[in-house]
Amino acid sequence: MGAELKDSEGAGVVASRRGAAMASRYISRLARVSSHLSPNPLMASEKEAALAAAPPSDSPTIFDKIINKEIPSTVVFEDDKVLAFRDISPQAPTHILIIPKVKDGLSGLSKAEERHFEILGRLLYTAKLVAKQEGLEDGFRIVINDGPSGCQSVYHLHIHLLGGRQMNWPPG
């Protein structure tokens, strides 16, 4: 017996149970990736994208493709250790992602070890430099989402730098 799935346009597709499960996983992964590539992701919220995200691992992520220039991005800062680029689905007038160029086991902040001390400091200092470069003298916010409950959707440590408007509290 088949199951009906809906594609991104809402059309029904009949599939076997196994095929339906595989298609559902594929759609979830596609939605997670598209949330960082498209201003109109398949999933409506970051929470849904985070819950659908693959568990943390050392497998390549969308950020690895950006680091390797396989996917275009608008880079605002780069050195030998860190890359900063504009988020393609900004949540503020200025929304920049700051990432280590080498993941080194840092799929999220909760995975940090003492050996990551230097890169963690470098990421925060880079956030300060980029904020100044972007003219955020009045203030800015940095955010690190960690794990599914923290709405992390890409398992490569990254800092969101948000600014250009009055932020609200509490944030989430």
Go through the PLM ranges and name each one.
Residues 2-172:
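HIT superfamily nucleotide-processing domains
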